[in-house]
Structure formats: structure tokens, C-alpha cells
Amino acid sequence: MSKEETQEIRQVQKEEEDNAEQEEGEVEEEEDKKSENESEEEVELEESKEKKLKSGNEVNKSSIKRRRSLYAGFDEKQDLFRPEFRFNNHDPVKEKMWALMDTYLKRDKLSVQKSIVQHIEYTLSKTRFEINSQYLFQGTALSVRDRLLEQWNDTQIFIKINNPKKVYYLSIEFLLGRLLQNALVCLDLEKCYKDALNEFGIKIEEIYEEENDPALGNGGLGRLAACYIDSMATLNLPAWGYGIRYDYGIFRQAIQNYEQKEFPDYWLTKGNPWEIMRLDTQFKVRFYGYCRDSSKNGKSCREWVGGEEVIAVAYDTAVPGFNTFNCNTLRLWKSFPSEEFDFEDFNRGDFQSALSDKDQASYITSVLYPNDNSLSGKELRLKQEYFFSSASVQNVVNEFSKLNLPWSDFPKYNTLQLNDTHPTLALVELMRILLDEKGLDYGEAFYIVQKTFNYTNHTVLPEALEKWGVDIFERLLPRHLEIIYLINYFFMEEVK
């Protein structure tokens, strides 16, 4: 801590605190100085390790540098985290950035308070005269998210280094509940934030009440999915949840004239401080069109062309585990148009047509379980299920491709769990990718799919099992219907 910062803190304490608070502040300053001294010793230790690395005593190709941090209470585990890479091609620019990222954020009360008010002023762009309980919630949540991101990023690097088998949990629902209190408990920071907010004149329970419940699920199916991804994080399993980022969720209930009225539950009215939009993670999802014979790398294949495309963009939320540094990912997909604006239609004065692609794309991720009593409703629901199944499978395939391993190893590194019937098109989508894009034979592709997927069945009642007419399926997903016929043909041949 610099002399200028120390003088500013002491000046504020003289003006706003009594003698007891001043003494407490001085104790905190001494602890900060002690932590800084320890940090300087750690840097010296790391510099000596770096010299050894340059002299060739370490692994030639690359090595991992793990720094100890200021993360209180878990010192014996710190060597597992804050990993960084060292390569032969020394880059002083990256070295400087890495040096500034070598420790965790502080967890003392004063640091937490600074973090909250800085987010209110600089992230939310609010003045000191505009602060209310909602802005305090937003600032608190963003402050907690900062500390989650440290563990989240470290977990992803740790997984990338060790390359274990990964679990992907596909569910059309995730009934998460409010996230702030769960995050604080998992980070062991609830008491610290409670004390910090008390000095702001607000109870932490009031902050909890400001959070909107994410409208991403309806009942037991979604709650089970949320419990699974939470438990897998606690069990230190490398897992991802895949679902849909709904704009309105299911519905908001109101009683008018003794009758139930349903209204959109726009849970995003106050924003969502937990999610991170991943503009670098997006995939094209096709609907309609037709299939034709083609060839790839001198090998005949089928090609799906025409129709319309939308873009699936990822929104990530950190899922912390309890009493562990492991922090997994819930990845939700939102639909965007491949061409958002038709300038020719707009210039002709046809403003509705100019934005029609944008509207059509937004319908897919608007509402959980759209009414399927009409033909258009059935089509929208099938679109919705294929949309998130396709984006999820493409994401998994894309990550595996980076390993440069044979496709026969795909089940050794990936397992996909399907939560009920809604994501079952993921099986056919993986078959399509392996057959049409990767050039595998039917036998190879089907073996990989069999070894990769698992399925949870929630009921055997016929009214709860989904059925789709061949006509609507063929119009919307022509190539997938061909693959289903192909699977059925080989199955019938096998059981003859």
C-alpha cells in the first residue's frame, strides 16, 4: 500500500469513523503491509525459479508455474492454482501481464467494500448520490463474480493441462434459484460480505431479496439438472451444463377476478450480473433446406444445403463447488439471426420484412415450452430442441478437434448425458457431423455415438413422451430424418 493510499484512508476514517473504527482500520493496514511483504518474498522466489527455467534445468518444451496467493484459509491447496505457462519463446509483454495476475483478490472487509463501490461507480456508472439496494446488489454480485472468475479460469486451465474425460449435461431446463448466497457460501465469504454491507447500513438479507430468480426451468426436471451440475462441481468433476438462455422463461402467474392470468416472466429486467456473453463461441444451426449427393476428399457423402440459418451464441455462468476450488460452467445458448438486417427491404419502406430474420431467430429462445397445440407451435418447439442440441454437440466436437486425436478416441474424452427426451436430437446431430463433415463410415460413427451418450428417462407415461410427425420432421430437419431411417434399417437387419 502506498503512502498516498494510506493518507486517504486515514483522512476518511477521521471524518466518518469513531475511535474504535480507526483502530480497526489501522489493524487492517498492518495486515495489508504484512501481506505485501509476503507477496514480495513470493515474487523473489518465483524469479529464482524463472532463472532455473532459463538455464535449462526445467522441462524444455513447457512447464507450469503455480504461485501461492493471498487466498486465506486454504494455504495448503494453493499450489494447485493460479497456473501459468512458460514457453521457450520468451515474451516479455506476456510476462508482465502474467506477473500482474499472479495472486487472488483480497478477501478482507475493506477490500470487499472497495470492490463493491468501484463496481457501482465504474461498471454500473452510478454516482454516490444514486446508490440504492438494487445497485448495491449489482455491485455485490459483480464483486463476488470477480472472485468466482479466478477459480473458474484456473479450473479451465487445470482441465486443459490434464485433459481428463469430461461430462456434458444437456437439459432444456435448469432451475437454478438465486445465485448470490450460494456463491458466497461456496467461496466461504458470506460473513465477510455480511459485515461489509452492515457498515453500508444494509442487511445482506435485503441484498439477497433484490436478485431475480432465473426463469430457466419449470419444475423437477430443471431442479434435478441444477442439482447435478452443482454436485459435479463439488465432486471436482470436469463438467459442463448445456441449455437455453430464455428471455421470458415459462410465465409469471397473476390472479385477476378469481382467475389465473399468465404473463411473460421477463427475469432479465434488472440484468444478469452472473453471465458472460462469449462472442468467440458461436455456431451456425440450420433448418429446412434439402439433401443432395456430394463428395468430400474423394469420398461420396450426403450434403444438407439451403434453408435458413441462425447463430447460437454462448452465455456462460460459473458454477462453484462447495469446499473446493473447482468451478464448472453452465453454458446457455441464445439465438441470433445470421443476417440481422435487410437493407434493401428497409430502403423500399418494408420495415417489417427488414427485421423479419431477427424476429424469427428471437422466437427460438424466447419461452420455455411454447404451446404446441398448433402446427407452428409444434415446429417452434422442435426448432428449440434441435437448436440447443446442435449448438452443444458442435461445441463438444470443436473442443475435441483441438486435441488432434483420432475420432475413435472421442468417447474416451467425452460423455454426454441427456436429461429426458428434449435433447435426444443430439445423437442424430453427432451422427450427421461424423458422417457428413468428418467423413467417417456408418459403423464407426454409430459406435462412437453409442459409447458417448447416456440418457435419463423421467417417466414411461405415453403423454409425457414426445412424438413428432414425419412431415414436420422432414421439412424442418431433412438430413436427420435420413439418418434416423438409416439407423432403423441397420437395426432391423441386425435383429432379423
Residue ranges and their predicted role:
Residues 1-16:
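N-terminal acidic, proline/glycine-rich, low-complexity intrinsically disordered segments
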Residues 24, 28-31, 38-496:
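A conserved ligand/cofactor-binding region detector
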